[in-house]
From Swiss-Prot:
PANTHER family: ATP-DEPENDENT DETHIOBIOTIN SYNTHETASE BIOD 2, DETHIOBIOTIN SYNTHETASE. Catalyzes a mechanistically unusual reaction, the ATP-dependent insertion of CO2 between the N7 and N8 nitrogen atoms of 7,8-diaminopelargonic acid (DAPA, also called 7,8-diammoniononanoate) to form a ureido ring. This is ATP-dependent dethiobiotin synthetase BioD. Keywords: ATP-binding, Biotin biosynthesis, Cytoplasm, Ligase, Magnesium, Metal-binding, Nucleotide-binding. It is found in: Cytoplasm. One of its GO terms (molecular function) is ATP binding. Disulfide bonds: none annotated.
Amino acid sequence: MKGLFISGSGTNVGKTFIAQYLIKFLTNILKVRVRKPVESDCKNKNGKLIPKDALLLSKACNIIESIDKICRYKFQACSSAQIASQALGLKLTLDDLVDACIADEFVVVEGAGGLLSPIATKTLNSDLVQAINVPVVLVIKDELGAVNQALLSINAAQHYKLNISMVVLNQIYPNLLGNEKEITQYTNANIVVFNQNDLKSFERQIEKILLADLIK
């Protein structure tokens, strides 16, 4: 399977936001499908659960699919997917999630939480990445403490022998902390800064990295 897995240092670091940019870039050169195999904290609208992150991914894509295809497992509880599924008596397994990720085109899969967040019964996001065997994009909120968060995520990925496509420092608010320079002293991973005021630099860097991933 060809694709990317979007993970990060935790929740609310901008995974979906960065994923949309990567998807929009990739749609310029190939057909892209998206998958959010499981999503918690879905809104209940007239008895139907609405996965907001999966909807955003779908809008960035150039292939129209049903939201149930994009996000197979939806939970209303604001908790980990593992806890949310168990609360409903559903034994969600790694095989279930792998099956929910399958696509016949290049696929961008967004996980839930960080690499070591539980996502199914005795299953972490890292287990899912291993199973579908695609490069991982690590999204880190670029703030004080980002160096530690980035290195923890990179070390976790390396421990599980995952292929790191890039680490994206998401500057939700532009800053001069210099985290990119600090992180590069401790890793050979590709470090890219997302800054709304310098999108061209971000696009140039991701183009080089993603094109290299595509020809592997």
